Amino acid sequence: MAFAVASQPDQARPAESELASSSAAAQYITDSCLSDGPVGRVGLEVEAHCYDPADPHRRPTWGEINDVLKSLPAMPGGSVVTVEPGGAVELSGPPIDGVVPAIEAMTTDQTTLRNAFAAAGLGLVLLGADPLRPAKRINPGARYRAMEQFFKASRTGVAGAAMMTSTASVQVNLDAGPAAGWADRVRLAHALGPTLVAIAANSPLLGGAFSGWRSTRQRVWSQLDSARCGPVLTASGDDPGTDWARYALKAPVMLVHSPEAVPVLHYLPFADWADGRELLGGRRPTRHDLEYHLTTLFPPVRPRQWLEIRYLDSVPDAIWPAVVFTLVSLLDDPVAADIAAEAVEPVATAWDIAARVGLGDQRLYTAANRLVAVAAERVPAGLGEAMQRLVTAVERARCPADDFSDQVIENGIRATVTWLARGDP
């Protein structure tokens, strides 16, 4: 979490009253999903796959990674370091006023983290999907174990395992902004998605083979239940609070606490639990159950009082600052937002096309060039080189996946991953 840390369930937590109905749950969601205020703060989260450069087929163990974490100094930019189910390492930065300071803080923390892992003989690689290793969970946490069981029971075990243990992203967290502009802002955050997916696609392989998709990460997400992982809004959504409430209540319950995370292995929409059509543990849900349920929903744009933008692949250091700057500029600058909304309208729902062919689609190519041009007009000098690199790539209809694919074709998967894990120039 970049803007706040949710309280964790505890056996000593005081008892709460049950929700009266799904209508009461909907009202709570609508009232609390976004926070009224100015825009300007930016929180970044960057995930990187962890490799052993001496044997990139080997997945470093939970113990090895934790030994590195125990020796870490405090991150100078304020990031919190966590480990994903498959051993990917995540830096979660605090909310910072302005996109450039947020990028600078994250870059500093990345250097600190990378140096610590290198000292332990391990490397961190920024790719949207693990190109080499099969899916495998190493994080023993109860939540991840329960999620794994849930996905298997819902017949999405393969995609669920890949999502949890083989994908990585750059997440951008932004203020919701003034309430009067929520509908337009949330709508634009969704509408930008396909074009930004095409620009930042960086996962052409998964588990040792080319997938046929520029963003295999996005493909994996699309194979999961759309009631949990699909977009909340259509391009014309006018009431983000109501839309989020409808989405959340329709989504099946994944986990409950008893007191640890326990999977719900049959289909039960949260609304049915709240209305008493079926009880879990002999009761209806409490507000805390509802809050926890919301953390098990993974749409590409998720309201958490702020906005979580979750649809970007993890991309190389040379380009992610420009991608982040582009996204933030298009949402936080009113003039840029108006231009962007018009530019992406023809491709506002083209998620699968963007993930499969990237900028090879002419409509996405046109929209992408307009977006990066608008951002380039606003870029400060310190990001000029990264922005020019992004503009040039988009003009050539290339995304990071194309560069990675070329390296793999020339050198092989193992050699390419080893090179990246070592951080060789």
Protein language model regions, located:
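Terminal catalytic/cofactor-binding subdomain
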Residues: M1-G160, S166, A201, Q305, ...
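Loop-rich catalytic cores of soluble enzymes, especially ATP-dependent carboxylate-amine ligases
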Residues: V125, A129-G157, A162-R302
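Non-catalytic surface loops within mature trypsin-like serine protease
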Residues: D52, A176-P178, D313
